């Protein structure tokens, strides 16, 4: 009996220690990496300025506004739609901290889905964060999830019905921001975020919207621009200019029958020219090996080298991988 009590006390103590350590790690996911306002940022807004119901939630993301001295066109750049696609988020951070606008206005939302920044996809063994060395020291960044945190929106339905079109998708797509547009003011958390972004475009009459993404190397639409039909002429020009610089990039039309995505709904429901950009990210692929900080930053994975040799990929892939510098560079060039 005495041994059983001692064993029980030890097990309870160990359980508390494990719970404390795990809880501490989970609490870290609520911490946001710092974004330094560059000299080009002239003002800031919140998504709650366009939908007050988001105030005080993780969906009340910052909107950085960079306005030039001369009037001109306007563009919205979205990062963090899927926070497990780090090149998209890093591109917007670079723009916020370094871009200066002479003419027109640039709107930037680095954390389009702030809730998805606060957790990882379950059973994927993804890192919570990754670190980049800079001349000013190390900087860390969150590695999040493709979907809204269940703490903010739960449970998932068996079937997700897109409100504007009636299209039916898998139930977990209800937490995918890029299946929620144009959104609803009285909808789910994810639909409210989509609605606020749509209202931002409408009320400011933003001319162009660029949604930054990444895709796994085995995904057909990769290293490409996906454009609404009204945005095809300008997107074609961008593709030609990038090809002239020896940057291979494809151009895909937005499927009219696939609803909820930025390049479809924002083009249909607003006057903006809606486009989406994809780069190659091995850390979110299904064929990857160990998912760690090194894979996120270097894009090197021997499994994908083998997959390339047997023709299973839609992007060139060798021992050099596709590092974060290349992926961010593609977004910035586009």
Which residues make up each language-model segment?
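C-terminal accessory segments enriched in acidic
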Residues: 2-65, 98, 102, 189-208, ...
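Proline/glycine-enriched tight loop/beta-turn segments at coil->beta junctions
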Residues: 67-74
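Short, solvent-exposed coil/turn elements at secondary-structure transition points
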Residues: 69, 112-114, 280-282
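Short hydrophobic beta-strand that contains or immediately precedes a catalytic carboxylate
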Residues: 76-79
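Active-site/substrate-binding loop(s) of hydrolase catalytic cores
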Residues: 86-87, 102-240
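Histidine-anchored nucleotide/phosphate-binding helix
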Residues: 92-97
